[in-house]
Amino acid sequence: MLSNPSELVTRNIEQLENQRVMLINIEADELGHHLTRHCSEVAALALDFNHFQAQPSGKSGFRCEFGHQWSRDEKFDVVVVYFPKAKALAPYLFALAAWHLRPDGTLLITGENKGGIRSVDKLLGNAFSPACKIDNARHCLLYSATLVAEATKPNAEDWVSRYRLSLPSGDIQICNMVGVFSDKQLDQGTALLLDNLPKLEGRVLDFGCGAGVIAIALMQQNPGLQLECVDINAMALLSCELSLKANGMEAKVYASDGLAQTDGLFNAIVSNPPFHDGLSSTTDIATRFVADSYKQLHKGGNWQIVANRHLPYSDTIAKVFGEVNTVAENNKYKVYANKKR
């Protein structure tokens, strides 16, 4: 199966025939494998861990990595960029593309009409010729541009916004990579969670760590924690690492699909889970998170999250933990706190 933006690429396969091709911000489909039948080589960079896991392994002529950058300084004839949902991330992806293109190489940009791709020319930068629209189908657009200037390798730290936050435990510095949501102030949900954290010790998991606000607060309030921070977004993981470093703290930061890549039991799991839209698919993921959390807590371990009050957590929490314990709430959020019996 192919996503609509990928279908648009295959409609223009002559652009890629017998070329060395790199895909940046790849989606969870089979385009990479499909292109091996037409291209001399295909490499793919996934910024979403779920998209990385969806790629076929062991396919001849296809390599895929997860992260914020490709691990090798390779050059390609064509780079295909999937226009990101977070438009602020686009210039960074185009800078990556410029670095990995040979002189006069071709950049293809594919994405949904509603995703902001029409503003591509304003975001391309000076390394490329003006973008030319070459196809329009399946509610998506495909643009092409040519590398016209020598590019330097993007330094990730040049794409960070740094700002200070005041927490109940003290002031901290946050390092936020482009494309990672932040309004440069403590959001109401996280603030409510941090105001109601118990004293913690031992091995603790920050699920959906984002830029590391909760992680740093946990370390401030509980020195000596064995803290682990997980997310599916490569830019969020880098943000968390940089934020911890900026505050003189250390934690294990890694990608995980839900809790699947975590190992062993935790004394506590704390989260502002990234499940906010109330869609059935999102609710299913949230339900699984509650059940998986229970399995990975020590007996007596703490489980504490903040969630939009309209999301249907209560029934699942009651079923899994045996009761629902709401320790704080306002007109938008609830903080749930339970122990494993």
UniProtKB/Swiss-Prot annotation:
Its EC number is 2.1.1.172. The keyword Cell division does not apply. The keyword Transferase applies. Keywords: Cytoplasm, Methyltransferase, rRNA processing, S-adenosyl-L-methionine, Transferase. Belongs to the methyltransferase superfamily. RsmC family. PANTHER family: RIBOSOMAL RNA SMALL SUBUNIT METHYLTRANSFERASE C. This is Ribosomal RNA small subunit methyltransferase C. It comes from Shewanella amazonensis (strain ATCC BAA-1098 / SB2B).
